[in-house]
Design a protein with these regions (language model features):
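Glycine-centered tight beta-turn/hairpin loop motif at sheet-sheet or coil-to-beta transitions
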Residues: 29-33
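Short, ordered, surface-exposed loop/turn motifs in non-cytosolic proteins
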Residues: 15-28
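Membrane-interfacial amphipathic helices and adjacent loop/beta segments
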Residues: 180
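Beta-strand-rich domain onsets/edges
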Residues: 1-15
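Feature responds to low-complexity, polar/acidic, surface-exposed segments characteristic
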Residues: 35-72, 79-106, 115, 119-135, ...
């Protein structure tokens, strides 16, 4: 990795001799790509992908991984992710009668409304301070994913005992399960109407966006990362997923792993 945040690739034959004019292409799970050809020294320098933090802690220094998340907080996450991928400023006006333009979440909700990521209620409210449920969050994640990928809902089934085929989010849950984003419970249920926790949120989002924490880098560089007073070590099951989500970093993404380079 150079000081300009570029990834260096060197090719050689079995005898260690440099190989020039080798075409190389890198592509991560977000479909960011870079390609080029090695020079006379067998070297090609390509940029690494930037993963921006999309979730933050609280003013008291905590993250509160097992707390629930509000619908407004969920909207903020997806707005940040879309803004990052599209290179747009987060702004927009919503038509929900309970979303004041003076609230911190107004632009986030307005921005997502433009892309059809969020749904309100029949009385034109959004209920920003209500907890977002597991099913609601999964549905939002699938809609977000469909902005950048060909999502074929309705092509999959799911066997959670509490998710009937006529459940409003059945096709979303089935798609997310097929994509590998979800874990249910040991008793075979999904509990879609339960409030989702902040730890569960980052786990789903990381999987849906192809972000995989580099545990080795994190362990060696804890002093450089954002710290939370209630997450001082890796004893919490979502420690690494939270580190991935809450720290902006450069990374080279492989099929089932990610190498942080800054």
């Amino acid at each position: 990795m150079t000081n300009d945040n570029y990834y260096t690739i060197k090719t050689s034959d079995s005898k260690g001799n440099a190989k020039a004019d080798i075409s190389i292409a890198l592509k991560d799970k977000k479909n960011n790509s870079a390609n080029g050809t090695t020079d006379k020294n067998g070297i090609l320098i390509l940029p690494a992908s930037e993963h921006k933090a999309y979730i933050f802690g609280y003013a008291d220094g905590t993250f509160r991984p097992d707390n629930n998340m509000s619908r407004a907080e969920a909207a903020a996450i997806f707005a940040r992710l879309i803004s990052e991928q599209k290179g747009e400023k987060i702004s927009g006006k919503s038509n929900f009668n309970d979303v004041s333009k003076n609230e911190w979440y107004s632009d986030y909700i307005g921005y997502l409304s433009k892309y059809g990521i969020i749904k309100g209620y029949s009385n034109s409210t959004f209920r920003p301070d209500d907890n977002v449920s597991r099913a609601e969050f999964v549905a939002m994640t699938v809609r977000f994913n469909s902005l950048f990928n060909d999502v074929k809902k309705g092509s999959y089934t799911v066997k959670y005992t509490d998710v009937a085929t006529n459940y409003w989010a059945y096709s979303d849950v089935a798609y997310a399960k097929h994509a590998g984003w979800l874990n249910g419970y040991a008793d075979g249920t999904f509990k879609g109407d339960n409030a989702i926790t902040r730890a569960e949120v980052v786990t789903v989002v990381n999987k849906a966006t192809g972000r995989i924490a580099d545990e080795g880098y994190i362990n060696k560089n804890l002093s450089l990362l954002n710290k939370f007073t209630d997450l001082k070590n890796n004893l919490h099951w979502a420690f690494y997923a939270i580190a991935e989500a809450s720290n902006t970093h450069l990374a080279n993404t492989h099929d089932n792993s990610e190498t942080w380079v800054k």
